[in-house]
């Protein structure tokens, strides 16, 4: 018996993995997660997550059109997420977006994950891309940290999942609309730059 946590509050708990989200959820309801219970609760969470994981998943406004435009302009696109690879691919398939990406890596794709630069560098390697010819777009401190550590310019979106104000993350640019991305990316990395 715990109180329900409003969706807007949950939004601020997302971004550092399911275990951290559970810890934050427990703290929000007034009681810390009991030591040793995390594995059991993770199993329960993942069971419910797998049953209804796509019910509320939608791209943010302008994302699909912008991805299509960037791809048509000759940019390679990738996803570098800490979400496990399998669920990431399932979501992309349900949304009909998997064909837009040249590489997709999850938190279980390499021995390391964001903010370790090996995660982003490994993703770039799958596309035969160099850090100087890439741009990271993200919504969290982990995204900015991995980009910085890998030597990749980074653009942060202002409407993502972070507990820190996005303008304090240290990104090179902050955008309020995904539609603004195309012009900024073209300035940072001209099409065809290797």
Task: For every predicted segment, state its role.
Residues 1-8, 19, 29:
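Conserved phosphoryl-transfer catalytic core
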Residues 16-17, 73-74, 169:
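Structured helix-beta-strand junction loops
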Residues 7-8, 32, 47, 84-194:
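Asp-based, Mg2+/Mn2+-dependent phosphohydrolase catalytic module
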Residues 47-79, 85-90, 114-117:
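Short, acidic loop-to-helix structural element flanking the phosphoryl-transfer center
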Residues 16-51, 61-64, 69:
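A metal-dependent, Asp-based hydrolase signature
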Residues 11-15:
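PIN/NYN-family metal-dependent endoribonuclease catalytic core
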Residues 1, 26-27, 50, 54, ...:
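A broad detector of the eukaryotic-type serine/threonine protein kinase catalytic domain
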Residues 1, 23, 27, 71, ...:
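Short polybasic/polar patches that bind polyanions
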């Amino acid at each position: 018996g715990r109180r329900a946590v409003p969706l807007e509050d949950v939004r601020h708990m997302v971004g550092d993995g399911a275990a951290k989200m559970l810890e934050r959820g427990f703290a929000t309801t007034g009681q810390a997660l009991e030591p040793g219970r995390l594995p059991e609760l993770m199993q329960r969470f993942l069971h419910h997550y797998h049953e209804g994981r796509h019910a509320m998943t939608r791209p943010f406004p302008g994302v699909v059109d912008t991805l299509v435009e960037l791809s048509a302009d000759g940019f390679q696109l990738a996803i570098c997420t800490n979400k496990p690879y399998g669920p990431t691919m399932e979501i992309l398939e349900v949304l009909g977006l998997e064909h837009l990406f040249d590489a997709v890596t999850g938190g279980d794709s390499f021995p390391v994950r964001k903010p370790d630069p090996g995660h982003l560098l490994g993703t770039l390697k799958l596309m035969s891309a160099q850090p100087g010819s890439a741009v990271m777009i993200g919504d969290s401190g982990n995204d900015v940290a991995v980009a910085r550590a890998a030597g990749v310019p980074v653009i942060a979106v202002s409407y993502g999942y972070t507990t820190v104000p996005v303008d304090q993350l240290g990104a090179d640019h902050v955008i309020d609309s995904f539609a603004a991305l195309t012009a900024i990316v073209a300035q940072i990395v001209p099409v065809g730059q290797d």
